[in-house]
């Protein structure tokens, strides 16, 4: 049986359809990455149909996102993912060493004439209740990543998942009251399986939509503020509203827009430095 490409593997990984968790895919060696998996990373404009609330196709839209080159896309996405995961670690695990554990100051029995092995403390690492050898200590696991590099990783993952993406009309006002059954019926009208992992990206989410979807364990409801790389890679289907598509095209669009933002930031910094120099001269 030939290996298949899932949504998870569409950007960086080759996965088995029987694998349900992302942890099996995080540490595959480059030798296990097929040419087909690399070829799915695209940079061209994706045309996606727009579905109505009833599931009918009412038009189409384009998703024009910047993607990393084929030879570096896997490394960019992998770096963005591992950085996010490392930055989520608290690093608060702590153990007591032999010098920190309470007690053990007195010698338990004389050095000689007991027939037993010599022992100077009851808090040796060899004894129960003793100190821990090479145990964990509080540590900062965070890793720095350039903003542009992180944005490139997200846009590459989104653009490579266009085949598993659908665009729908705004449906916030369609739910007059919270009803999970109605939301599941809506997913099926859009061709989504409630048992598959789905990611909904909306610029504005009403309370009724949140309450109707939160009991579906395979569904993630995100906004532009909570959009992250792990949830994109961990989902099998991606559902975008029309306003979310406009946001993605504006935020993760072509390189010129990114350069313009950097120039604006540089101008702001230059202006701040000029003001400081003026104040110092006065």
Swiss-Prot record:
GO biological process, one term: translation
Coiled-coil residue spans: none
One Gene Ontology molecular-function label: structural constituent of ribosome
This protein's UniProt keywords: Chloroplast, Plastid, Ribonucleoprotein, Ribosomal protein, RNA-binding, rRNA-binding, Transit peptide
Main location (coarse class): plastid
GO cellular component annotations of the record: chloroplast; ribonucleoprotein complex; ribosome
Chain segment of the transit peptide: 1-43
Acidic residues composition bias: residue spans: 255-282
Subcellular localization: Plastid, Chloroplast
Region (Disordered) residue spans: 86-133, 251-282
Superkingdom, taxonomy of origin: Eukaryota
Function according to Swiss-Prot or TrEMBL: This protein binds directly and specifically to 23S rRNA. May play a role in plastid transcriptional regulation.
Family in the record: Belongs to the universal ribosomal protein uL4 family.
Subunit structure: Part of the 50S ribosomal subunit.
Xref: PANTHER family: 50S RIBOSOMAL PROTEIN L4, LARGE RIBOSOMAL SUBUNIT PROTEIN UL4C
UniProt xrefs under NCBIfam families: rplD_bact (TIGR03953)
Protein name per UniProt: Large ribosomal subunit protein uL4c
Species of the source: Nicotiana tabacum
Taxonomy of the source species: Eukaryota, Viridiplantae, Streptophyta, Embryophyta, Tracheophyta
